[in-house]
Design a protein with these regions (language model features):
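A Rossmann-like FAD-binding core segment of flavoenzymes
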Residues: 26-28, 73-91, 97, 163-260
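C-terminal auxiliary extensions adjacent to catalytic cores
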Residues: 350-410
Length: 421
């Protein structure tokens, strides 16, 4: 019998292990991981493909982490069924794992596109370490690649392939890139930077067909244009990994609904990370927030509750820190401008900087900073804490907010004693 059974081995799982061990030093912890690799930093896989970091640098938690925390780690073990009534998880090999408390931290997987001509050699996803190893084996300088999807995953794949010397085209179905976290004005700045790097960007279009016999030779777009390529990367979004829960009785919407303790509607079964449909305090709705920091925090909270230490989540909202060809971007909170919200924009074309905030009910609820990202952390903190803008509103409008403008009590929280001087 496993006191604690965790399905998954990424950010949420490691957070849960640490959460459990802060409360329970002795309970048995078993981790089932579909992947054969140790926990690695998924946001770094594009840097690994580009050759900016080696394989050791992307390991997030090494073997010493599992041994120190007395974790029974089962790599290459995929869970295929959960029975909450019997408190048993069954793996693909038919082995049964009984448990007292269960955490589902299976993350997400790429959306499979139903394209005519799919299944050819040279067609890849770009989501996990195996995808990167496969790409490393086949790509070579001078090749042509098409990336389907202009979101975070697609653009990081495109950047890495371009840095490896490939001729890259990005095809995005929406009117502009990163449409889930940027507005059109900031996306235009990003698109210009990407085009200058040598990557072709096609928006408002789709890939309809993959050409070639056994190998990828090109694609046909919805517009009818044909593009030659030997590598095709599909990066059109992700979905939570919940198919193995089909007969479990655990409810699944867009993700697995959880309460403030990260517990599902089945007692003793918790969920955390990209697989979760949790509370977004800004939109005041349940939603999936598939970002690394949220996954870790949710796992930590789940782990502590599993071990008997009550802890509640205040919810998670979207936030991202990214860079494309040297252009730094930080976003947080709400994107769309709704009734009653004030939008403030500052754009300096000469410095290639863009700043946009949303204010609602005298509180900062959304932010985009591009180029100059100083004080983005302060703004994100203000969003998280729902801090009234008050006298800071004029500073927010001018984009000149810095720590000295914050109340002394807030500076001490953010920066310690040095911050109040």
């Amino acid at each position: 019998m496993n006191d604690y059974l965790i399905i998954g081995n990424s950010a949420a799982a490691t957070g849960a292990i640490e959460g459990i061990r802060t409360v329970d030093k002795k309970g048995d912890i078993t981790v089932l991981s579909e992947e054969a690799h140790l926990c690695y930093s998924r946001p770094l896989i594009s840097y690994f493909l580009a050759g900016k970091v080696d394989g050791e640098k992307i390991i997030y938690r090494g073997r010493d982490f599992y041994s120190k925390n007395k974790v029974n780690l089962h790599l290459g073990s995929r869970a295929i069924e959960v029975d909450p009534d019997k408190k048993v998880v069954t793996s693909e090999g038919g082995r049964e794992y009984p448990y007292q408390k269960l955490l589902i931290a299976t993350g997400s997987s790429p959306l499979a596109l139903l394209l005519k001509g799919s299944g050819k050699k040279g067609q890849h996803f770009f989501y996990n370490l195996n995808d990167v190893y496969h790409l490393k084996e086949i790509i070579k300088e001078g090749d042509s690649a098409v990336v389907v999807g202009g979101g975070l995953i697609g653009l990081k794949a495109a950047e890495a392939l371009s840095l490896k010397g490939l001729k890259v085209t990005v095809v995005e179905k929406t009117p502009y890139l990163l449409s889930s976290i940027l507005n059109q004005a900031s996306a235009t700045i990003l698109e210009e930077r990407i085009r200058k790097s040598g990557i072709r960007v096609i928006v408002n279009n789709t890939v309809e067909e993959i050409t070639g016999t056994d190998k990828v030779e090109g694609v046909i777009l919805g517009s009818g244009e044909r593009i030659s390529c030997t590598t095709l990367v599909l990066a059109a979004g992700v979905k939570p990994n919940t198919s193995f829960l089909e007969n479990s009785g655990i409810p699944v919407n867009r993700g697995i609904p959880v309460n403030e303790k990260m517990e599902t509607q089945r007692e003793g079964v918790y969920a955390a990370g990209d697989v979760v449909e949790g509370w977004d305090p800004l939109s005041e709705n349940k939603r999936v927030v598939p970002i690394w920091p949220a996954a870790y925090c949710q796992g930590l909270i789940a782990g502590k509750n599993m071990a008997g230490h009550p802890m509640k989540s205040s919810g998670e909202f979207p936030r991202n820190s990214i860079s494309f060809f040297g252009l730094n971007i930080i976003t947080a909170g709400l994107l769309e401008v709704n009734s009653g919200e004030e939008e403030i924009i500052n754009y300096n074309e000469d410095k290639n900087t863009y700043y946009r905030v949303l204010i609602k009910d005298n509180r900062l609820v959304g932010m985009i900073k591009m180029g100059d990202i100083k004080e983005a952390g302060v703004l994100t903190w203000m969003i998280k804490k729902k801090m009234p803008a008050g006298d800071l509103k004029e500073k927010l409008k001018s984009g000149s907010l810095n720590p000295v403008h914050l109340p002394e009590s807030i500076r001490s929280i953010l920066y310690g004693e040095e911050g109040v001087k």
